[in-house]
């Protein structure tokens, strides 16, 4: 199972890049991610971007804005982040260069013979490859916002009408600010019907610990 945690604009389009979304929205979604993954069965693996999480953590003095421990993808994209001290209190997760490569590792059994649930936290620049290369059931949990994004929007490749329902937010520190500001329209849970099967994911060459060559390695 793959779950994507993200946001959409008032027209239902998704952000193409993480910096196109206000940092306070990512802070809210990071808090919701922690609550959503807390009681799930199986081993939770959260995939996120280093710059995005530093920005979310910099919006608050508490540690609740950082997603549950998992893998991070460091893209080195520029981001005007207000510091990242919130990450210092957490062990640094293993670092990978591809969300598809991470999924292949989990699916191969080399990471352990146990059920995994991958959660991908961010914008389309992080999760779009899932829709091209991963055949697993994919669902979205996203916040629809009363805004349009600064950069190019990304359209979800649906085959038919959205299979969606509202979901109630957890009471987290960032929720009142979004509600009071009229930014948050609704929260949506959607199972994505993608139609045709995606292309097979590329195999990565084997290497110690299951990480691709050249990738920084910091296993929890």
From Swiss-Prot:
Pfam families: US2 (PF02476)
Family: Belongs to the herpesviridae US2 family.
Protein's UniProt name: Protein US2 homolog
Organism of origin: Bovine herpesvirus 1.2 (strain ST)
Taxonomic placement: Viruses, Duplodnaviria, Heunggongvirae, Peploviricota, Herviviricetes
